[in-house]
Amino acid sequence: MTRDWLRRGLRFLLFAMLGFVGLSVLLVLVFRVVPVFGSMVMLERKVESWVSGEPVSIQQQWRPWNALSDNAKLAVIASEDQRFPMHHGFDFNQMQKALDAWFSGDSLRGASTISQQTAKNLFLWTDRSWVRKGLEAWFTVLIELLWPKERILEVYLNIVEWDRGVFGLEAAAQHYFGVSADRLSAAQASRLAAILPNPREWSASRPSSYIVKRSQWIQRQMRQLGGSAYLERL
């Protein structure tokens, strides 16, 4: 009897794992070609607002690659992940630097790539549990295998959070500057990129001195990367 239960348990576990793998691969393949009008983080924010009793309206409008400002594409890469065209989802150089700084006494800083952030924002939730990190790694591998780099950045720019209830570049451009996503200047794009580490607390339209300095640094990095020509490497 015990062996039968063990055999059934192992069989169930095997089928559950195969089902998860199949479903996750299918989801990633679907989102390779289908516009993304929602994400797990958006759903999480709606649930949070319902629990807190503070309603929030989600603003998000999908824009295809050619309707997204090159300035914004480059600013986000310059700010978040300068090795984005080269790595395969994980930047081990940045991970090592973050660990070295931590061992030296600094606070542990993030080293997530744009690919990792896309996986987390689209498919997962925002806590820092090991379960979530493991699933993030799995989905990162899948999107790196099944999507071109251009698609990863396109989805990221359309779903990333830029303020309370504001998701995606089009909504952020309208919210902060009153322009469409394809009309963002280098200065505006750099400010949007500068607030990404803490978008619900920082503002691109009313920047602190820190955000001003960070956006200036991002613009310098954009020039050093080679401007829009850098995007041809994607």
UniProtKB/Swiss-Prot annotation:
Pfam families, from UniProt? Transgly (PF00912)
Residues annotated as signal peptide = none
Q: Which UniProt keywords apply?
A: Cell inner membrane, Cell membrane, Cell shape, Cell wall biogenesis/degradation, Glycosyltransferase, Membrane, Peptidoglycan synthesis, Transferase, Transmembrane, Transmembrane helix
EC number(s) recorded for this UniProt protein: 2.4.99.28
Q: How does it sit in the membrane?
A: Single-pass membrane protein
The reply on keyword Signal is: no
Regions crossing the membrane:
11-31
Q: Could you mention a single GO BP entry for this protein?
A: peptidoglycan biosynthetic process
Highest taxon, organism lineage: Bacteria
Q: Name one GO molecular function term.
A: peptidoglycan glycosyltransferase activity
Tell me the pathway: Cell wall biogenesis; peptidoglycan biosynthesis
Judged by the first EC level, this protein's enzyme class is transferase
Reactions mediated catalytically: [GlcNAc-(1->4)-Mur2Ac(oyl-L-Ala-gamma-D-Glu-L-Lys-D-Ala-D-Ala)](n)-di-trans,octa-cis-undecaprenyl diphosphate + beta-D-GlcNAc-(1->4)-Mur2Ac(oyl-L-Ala-gamma-D-Glu-L-Lys-D-Ala-D-Ala)-di-trans,octa-cis-undecaprenyl diphosphate = [GlcNAc-(1->4)-Mur2Ac(oyl-L-Ala-gamma-D-Glu-L-Lys-D-Ala-D-Ala)](n+1)-di-trans,octa-cis-undecaprenyl diphosphate + di-trans,octa-cis-undecaprenyl diphosphate + H(+)
Give the location in the cell: Cell inner membrane
One GO cellular component term, please give it.
plasma membrane
Q: Does the keyword Iron-sulfur apply?
A: no
Give the protein family.
Belongs to the glycosyltransferase 51 family.
Protein role: Peptidoglycan polymerase that catalyzes glycan chain elongation from lipid-linked precursors.
- The protein's name in its UniProt record: Biosynthetic peptidoglycan transglycosylase
Provide the species name. Chromohalobacter salexigens (strain ATCC BAA-138 / DSM 3043 / CIP 106854 / NCIMB 13768 / 1H11)
Q: What is the taxonomic lineage of the source species?
A: Bacteria, Pseudomonadati, Pseudomonadota, Gammaproteobacteria, Oceanospirillales
Its gene? mtgA
